[in-house]
Curated annotation (Swiss-Prot):
Any one GO molecular-function label of the UniProt entry: tRNA binding
Family in the record: Belongs to the universal ribosomal protein uS13 family.
Annotated HAMAP family: Ribosomal_uS13
Subunit structure: Part of the 30S ribosomal subunit. Forms a loose heterodimer with protein S19. Forms two bridges to the 50S subunit in the 70S ribosome.
PROSITE patterns the UniProt entry points to: RIBOSOMAL_S13_1, RIBOSOMAL_S13_2
UniProt entry keywords in alphabetical sequence: Ribonucleoprotein, Ribosomal protein, RNA-binding, rRNA-binding, tRNA-binding
Organism annotation: Rhizobium etli (strain ATCC 51251 / DSM 11541 / JCM 21823 / NBRC 15573 / CFN 42)
Stretch list, region Disordered: 99-122
PANTHER family: 30S RIBOSOMAL PROTEIN S13/40S RIBOSOMAL PROTEIN S18, SMALL RIBOSOMAL SUBUNIT PROTEIN US13M
Xref: InterPro entries: Rbsml_uS13_C, Ribosomal_uS13, Ribosomal_uS13-like_H2TH, Ribosomal_uS13_bac-type, Ribosomal_uS13_CS
UniProt cross-references to SUPFAM superfamilies, sorted A to Z: S13-like H2TH domain
Protein name (database record): Small ribosomal subunit protein uS13
Length: 122
């Protein structure tokens, strides 16, 4: 298995697909990386030379924010909103939907399992 950006990527898959296993790299960025490095799109990971793997690794390190750095930045952005006390920050703090979705019904994923209300009958 090739190790890129701290992630073991599967060797049997095509390079474009395997790169999407890295947090922060989707199909679009994976295609971009392969084109920058100059690897054919149908090439599989186990067919890559060490030099090509190194080129991919350097391209990702230089041009993209992935894995831990990306997760850290996302967490810091959410923390900043919460510290500001803005509406979006309050919604994050309360564990409710942030982007204007309805909460009277639905939103169970964000709110967690339904809580029983004492004295309420069907």
């Amino acid at each position: 298995m090739a190790r890129i950006a701290g992630v073991n990527i599967p060797t049997a898959k095509r390079v474009v697909i395997a790169l999407t296993y890295i947090h922060g790299i989707g199909p679009k960025f994976a295609q971009e990386i392969v084109e920058k490095v100059g690897i054919p799109a149908e090439r599989r990971v186990h067919q890559l030379t060490d030099a090509e793997v190194l080129q991919i690794r350097e391209t990702i390190d230089r041009d993209y924010q992935v894995e831990g750095d990306l997760r850290r930045e996302t967490a810091m952005n959410i923390k900043r909103l919460m510290d500001l006390g803005c509406y979006r920050g309050l919604r994050h703090r309360r564990g409710l939907p942030v982007r204007g979705q309805r909460t009277h019904t639905n939103a169970r994923t964000r709110k967690g399992p339904a809580k029983a209300i004492a004295g309420k009958k069907k």
